[in-house]
Amino acid sequence: MKKKPFYKVLYVQVIFAIIVGVILGHYYPALATDMKPLGDGFIKLIKMVIGPIIFCTVVTGIAGMEDMKKVGRVGGKALLYFEIVSTFALLLGLAATHILRPGVGFNIDPATLDGKAVASYAAKAHGQSTVDFLMHIIPNTMVDAFAQGEILQILLIALLFGSVLAHLGERGKVVTDFIDGLTRVLFGIVHIVTKLAPIGAFGAMAFTIGKYGVGSLVPLLKLIGTFYLTSVVFVLVVLGTIARFTGFSIIRFVSYIKEELLIVLGTSSSEAALPQLMEKLEKAGCSRSVVGLVVPTGYSFNLDGTNIYMTMAVLFIAQATNIELTWMQQLTLLAVAMLTSKGASGVTGAGFITLAATLAVVPTIPLSGMVLILGIDRFMSECRALTNIVGNGVATVVVSAWEKELDRNKLRQALTGGGEVTTTETAGV
């Protein structure tokens, strides 16, 4: 097959678009901020099909399961994995901030901080108890769940729908076949929309640099550098070790999903690449049923980048305002962060709202301290989203392996660039 010219390769186009966006934002900030609708429009096009794709993928996956106990088993294994890896992410963020101490030397007086700029985030975070979160998973109506794009609500509906179809067996085959056909149509739409990724990445990056400016990064470069370094260490060491024990290379896996990562980099939203990631994971040998359950659930329960960010940001604010946290307070912070990080969607700004919810239960640190990182949160959002999507991809491969539903031949072919295969070699770790 004839190789594509490099300028027609999607990830090359996205890289070029990001570079052009940065240049425009730096030299023509007023014009660059007007590019925001390009990024917003691309994300809206992707979000338009996320709900239906999750519904169809989960329904067909569950309907094809002969043993309904398997649904609970896969979900249980996924949640166990999420909790273990999330805890590592939270601890790594805490440890890195203690070692590198990015907030030391700021000597900020908490009384001089104006909390008005972060009041809206605090308001959104206030009062979100565990009960509220669980009740929110239940939609008012089925239509409302799709209209609002609530992933967990759609997942609940799909689980019920798929379970009933599995119970009906042959009597439900017509409906299952229809939904399977609809899935193919939806992924066809995603392929069309993905071609617009360079435009979306350009618009989002131009707006970010134009509005906030590269200069806004300078005073807080140490925090940004600490966060990016910690995230890289997490991916290479923590996820890399998990990948190695599962039988694949984290470097090759990251290379395999590079187009999705660049879309996320340009838009700062891991949701922007959700449909493409699901398709890539299936092509890499993960079973549809596992992909359909693990990926959507991971977007609320397995946000590794957000976990690193939360403990790091809280400790940074404490260091910058010269507030000493006891070990008991830090353990409380970890426990609270494990709860507040669940349900945070992979969209831009969600991490900041989650941070507000975490700070609200650590009274010794002023909520107004969030002002210190408000200006750079948008630049840290990219790294959060990138870490989140890699984490969810690895989680899906691992759970597929645990379930002995990982086609290792396909995985090997995909990660080495050998193309698709037709033989099936299903095995677990």
From Swiss-Prot:
Signal sequence coordinates: none
GO BP field: L-aspartate transmembrane transport
InterPro entries, alphabetized: C4_dicarb_transport, Na-dicarboxylate_symporter, Na-dicarboxylate_symporter_CS, Na:dicarbo_symporter_sf
TM ranges: 9-29, 45-65, 79-99, 149-169, 185-205, 223-243, 308-328, 356-376
GO molecular function: fumarate transmembrane transporter activity; malate:proton symporter activity; succinate transmembrane transporter activity
Pfam families recorded: SDF (PF00375)
Location in the cell: Cell inner membrane
UniProt membrane topology term: Multi-pass membrane protein
GO cellular component terms listed in the entry, alphabetical order: plasma membrane
Keywords, comma-separated and alphabetical: Cell inner membrane, Cell membrane, Membrane, Symport, Transmembrane, Transmembrane helix, Transport
Gene3D superfamilies assigned to the protein according to its UniProt record, in alphabetical order: Sodium:dicarboxylate symporter (1.10.3860.10)
Protein family membership: Belongs to the dicarboxylate/amino acid:cation symporter (DAACS) (TC 2.A.23) family.
Annotated function: Responsible for the transport of dicarboxylates such as succinate, fumarate, and malate from the periplasm across the membrane.
Descriptive protein name: C4-dicarboxylate transport protein
Organism: Burkholderia lata (strain ATCC 17760 / DSM 23089 / LMG 22485 / NCIMB 9086 / R18194 / 383)
